[in-house]
Amino acid sequence: MSVLLFGVSHRSAPVSVLEQLSVDDSDQAKLIDQVLQSSLVTEAMVLSTCNRVEIYAVVEAFHGGLSVIGQVLSEHSGMSLQDLTKHAYVRYAEAAVEHLFSVAGGLDSAVIGEQQVLGQVRRAYASAEANHTVGRTLHELSQRALAVGKRVHSETGIDAAGASVVSVALDTAEKKVGSLAGRSAVLVGAGSMGALAAKQLMRAGVERIHVVNRTLPRAAKLAENVRSYGITAEAFPFDHLPPLLTDADIVVTCTGAVRPVVSLADVHRGLAHVREPKELVICDLGMPRDVDPAVAGLPGVFVVDMERILREPTARAAATDADAARTIVAAEVAKYLAGQRMAEVTPTVTALRQRAADVVEAELLRLDNRLPGLDAAHRDEVANTVRRVVDKLLHAPTVRVKQLAGAPGGDSYAEALRELFELDQHAVDAVAGTELGPLAGGDELGSLAIDLDMTE
């Protein structure tokens, strides 16, 4: 059995799709119950945030498990399976492990390095555990992911990476138009990056912030938060953007959309009513870009995009922290997978030792029958000698096979051991079931990774 991830996030879908897929606490339990009704799925967990909905499951078969999860999410969202898969990404086995570790480390967030997602992973696991839908595989995977996330945040400066991008953009803007103190700003996007941008704009001394977002309630919530700091703020839907540009000095965009949301026509309309010539700075923090590239060619408009931002020393330092975090994730993935492979060979080794013990006991019984007059002391000495010989013969190969099993492709060594010593697979499975204890499941990790959408 392997881990399968089926997800949709800000990287693969527009906000409208994420809204259709949104999952609250009661929805989570319902979704998992539906997924687990299939015999192909043995464990499941839902990770739901404002920027992603992901189902992690332990499945008996890749295609069967994928079909089950896709159908459940299709019914939940009201989208056809065909439309859903246009925005979905799939990770399997090693790739699923790497993805969850990256998510926990803040590397897949709209704001690189944000810590909120670590708590969201913890709550996703706690909810699944409370509903008894995680077994040994997802338990171990989740606990390791949480540990990796903590390590990334404690050993790198990635926490400041997102803030660095915004601050570098605003510093660049000030070089063009001077101090932002007392200025008017338009903020396009009210997600986690938008909240961070609002904070940086307030620190820069802006007098007024107009928050524009596809969903007005979300914009209103951010505007209310801004007002709590004594700054004038109002919320507007997207179609109000052009008139807001007329009085704006700076625009910051960070929507996470998959295509530009600020068009050349929008900016044309906004600047058409400007009474006196002015410079407008637009900081496009979107990846991919939020602003139509043609906007940069308009007179009086200066666009600061991610390409320009990442050329700045501070932003490059933040990128270095992200690279360091990715290095940690890669090392932890390799360590986790090696541990899983070693754990998989353990039942085979245990079955081999049990087989050897059974042979020893059978031979000692045969000895008792052939030499009934053998006194207890001599009998014990013979028994101990035979057991020591068997233990010494088995020690080197069993230790070595565990070491070799930790390497990629190491499962072949366990198979060779079963063939060489004619170990009954049912006996090995019985040992494995005993060693798993109350947590069901296992993790036979392969290397298949599939994308239904290459934007992820």
Swiss-Prot record:
Active-site residues annotated for this sequence: 50 (nucleophile)
Principal EC category: oxidoreductase
GO MF, any single term: NADP binding
Pathway of action: Porphyrin-containing compound metabolism; protoporphyrin-IX biosynthesis; 5-aminolevulinate from L-glutamyl-tRNA(Glu): step 1/2
ATP-binding is among the record's keywords: no
Catalytic activity: (S)-4-amino-5-oxopentanoate + tRNA(Glu) + NADP(+) = L-glutamyl-tRNA(Glu) + NADPH + H(+)
Annotated positions binding substrate: 49-52, 109, 114-116, 120
Disulfide bonds: none
Enzyme Commission number: 1.2.1.70
Stated role: Catalyzes the NADPH-dependent reduction of glutamyl-tRNA(Glu) to glutamate 1-semialdehyde (GSA).
Subunit structure: Homodimer.
Remarks, miscellaneous: During catalysis, the active site Cys acts as a nucleophile attacking the alpha-carbonyl group of tRNA-bound glutamate with the formation of a thioester intermediate between enzyme and glutamate, and the concomitant release of tRNA(Glu). The thioester intermediate is finally reduced by direct hydride transfer from NADPH, to form the product GSA.
Record remark: domains: Possesses an unusual extended V-shaped dimeric structure with each monomer consisting of three distinct domains arranged along a curved 'spinal' alpha-helix. The N-terminal catalytic domain specifically recognizes the glutamate moiety of the substrate. The second domain is the NADPH-binding domain, and the third C-terminal domain is responsible for dimerization.
Full protein name: Glutamyl-tRNA reductase
Organism whose genome encodes this protein: Mycolicibacterium vanbaalenii (strain DSM 7251 / JCM 13017 / BCRC 16820 / KCTC 9966 / NRRL B-24157 / PYR-1) (Mycobacterium vanbaalenii)
Name of encoding gene: hemA
